Amino acid sequence: MFIDYSKILKKNLKNVLHEVLVIIENKGLKEGHHLYITFDKNHKKLKIPNWLKNKHKNNITIVIQYEFWNLKVQKNEFSIDLSFNNTIANLTVPFDSIISFADPYANFGLQIAKDNSLKKEKKEKSKIHKNKIINLDKYRKN
């Protein structure tokens, strides 16, 4: 049985952000703390206004600090209202779309590998294992 450490680690990194957001949802954001959350704008379950999606190439970074409302944290996603140039936008962000998050006040940040990089890593490991197979037939006595 293959133990997929990358998958386990990625799941637990997302759980750190999930727990932080639950704390903020229940108790608010303490003075000084602020989060930078970067996510893949092309994730299939991401729900953001088109004008915001069109403004960015691949990834979007949001800041949760002063002007945010209605933070709701679910098992697989969170939703939040944020102000962009005096326009309120509702975002629903799946945890699977998260690339990184940081709290500069706490000097804390995490980088979360994308799924396709994990698949590439597995493929490379698979090639390595195939190359280590030794055919013993030539060493056998008849």
Residue ranges and their predicted role:
Residues 93-102:
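Phosphoinositide-dependent membrane-docking surfaces
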Residues 2-3:
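N-terminal targeting peptides, primarily Sec-dependent signal peptides
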Residues 104-116:
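Short acidic, Gly/Pro-enriched loop/turn segments at secondary-structure junctions
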